[in-house]
Design a protein with these regions (language model features):
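Phosphate/diphosphate-binding loops
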Residues: 143-201, 289-368
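Acidic, glycine-rich active-site loops and adjacent beta-strand->loop/helix elements
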Residues: 70-74, 109-117, 125, 166-172, ...
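Acidic low-complexity segments
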Residues: 109-122, 130-139, 143-146, 153
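Gly-rich Lys/Arg/Thr-decorated short loops/hinges at beta-loop-alpha junctions or inter-strand turns
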Residues: 65-76, 107, 111, 115-118, ...
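Intein/HINT protein-splicing elements and their conserved insertion hotspots or analogous self-processing inserts
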Residues: 1-32, 134, 196, 202-241, ...
Length: 368
């Protein structure tokens, strides 16, 4: 297992793979699903325990499908409250889009320290004292205003309405609670789901990849400097519009957004949940910077990107529609394979090979 494989597998099977997080009782999700099913039979089409990007609910008494996603973005708001609140909102919106829906409404909740208390905003925010000379000292109220503005600016860009929210100043922790819920209306005939459907399907990426959002690489010692994910407002809207245009072809077989651990996590999850494999050419990925490395292309969490899967015969039609929306960057970067592993290459060189089902020994290595 090389360093890149270890970093990606740690993200997949430790950071993102909540099934092995004993702090979460998944029986609660099952009970909630059962309660919804008893109250509104057959209304819950995709539940919160379905290993997908969002839940899908058939509104009783209508043919309207509602897509919902709740997401927290707490710790990142300590050093960068504006950008992190905005990317949290944008990420939840992408999750709704990934199910084949157009985001419409957002509700938020912010829990923080009392308004008048001072907080450190910047790299030393978690320490409570600045030693780098780059932080700002501000009141909790000022930090709240930055977080609210980040959410509001993303909503304005995406034409999503903020319809309500909650607020508390009873939190004593340095880390604020920043939670958003996004509601959307299904625009595809049926919910699009994350699992890969067929070997041979092509993988299309929408949006460009940069070097920001490199937390996973930084923790693995693969880069020297951490670069937080940057809120890309205009690009986020362009990616959404391009994705919705692709949906109009009725040729999209699977869809997912790119969040934590980037292309690596998105491709590995779609393949594993579909019981298939994948092969990806990282050199084919559209990039924002010229000197980006293969591992940065693979794992960085650049915002405003989506992943689609289509049959080979439909690639040209789908790409043409995507690119018709403000000339959005899009490319075929790989294909689904009839395999049990995901292979990432760069100019013919294997960068990482990730098994769908790591052995206990491999999982144990991730903690070392």
């Amino acid at each position: 297992m090389n360093k890149i494989e270890k970093a990606l597998m740690h993200a997949l099977f430790v950071h993102l793979h909540h099934n092995i997080d004993k702090a979460i009782d998944f029986s609660i999700f099952k009970k909630l699903n059962q309660k919804v099913g008893q109250t509104w039979p057959a209304a819950l089409l995709v539940g919160p325990d379905a290993n997908d990007d969002a839940a899908v609910f058939n509104m009783p008494g209508s043919d309207c499908l509602v897509v919902a996603k709740m997401e927290s973005h707490c710790s990142p708001c300590v050093p960068r409250p504006y950008d992190s609140a905005a990317t949290g909102a944008g990420g939840a919106m992408r999750d709704v889009v990934a199910m084949g829906a157009r985001p419409i409404f957002l509700l938020d909740f912010i829990g923080t320290r009392p308004m008048e208390q001072e907080v450190i905003v910047g790299p030393c925010g978690f320490d409570g004292k600045c030693t780098c000379g780059k932080c700002q000292v501000m009141t909790s109220q000022d930090r709240i205003n930055l977080m609210l503005k980040g959410i509001a600016d993303m909503c304005e860009t995406m034409e999503v309405f903020v319809v309500g929210g909650g607020f508390s100043t009873s939190f004593s922790d340095i880390v604020p609670a920043v939670v958003v819920s996004v509601i959307g209306k299904q625009v595809t005939d049926q919910p699009l789901t994350k699992p890969a459907k067929s070997a041979g399907d092509k993988i299309i990426i929408i949006g460009e990849t940069g070097t920001d959002g490199n937390d996973t690489l930084y923790r693995a010692g693969l880069v020297d400097t951490m670069q937080p994910a940057i809120a890309l407002f205009k690009e986020e809207r362009m990616a959404m519009d391009a994705t919705l245009a692709a949906f109009a072809t009725n040729k999209i077989k699977a869809c997912s957004d790119l969040g934590a651990a980037g292309i690596g996590a998105a491709v590995c999850e779609t393949a594993r949940f579909g019981g298939l494999g994948a092969k990806v050419d990282l050199a084919a990925v559209p990039v924002r910077v010229a000197d980006i490395t293969p591992e940065e292309i693979l794992i960085c969490e650049t915002q405003a990107r989506m992943l689609l899967q289509v049959e080979p015969a439909d690639v040209d039609e789908v790409l043409a529609l995507i690119r018709s929306k403000n000339d959005v960057a899009a490319a075929v970067i790989g294909e689904i394979t009839n395999d049990d592993q995901i292979v990432f290459e760069y100019n013919g060189e294997k960068i990482a090979v990730i098994p769908n089902h790591p052995s206990p020994e491999e999982i144990q290595q991730l903690g070392n």
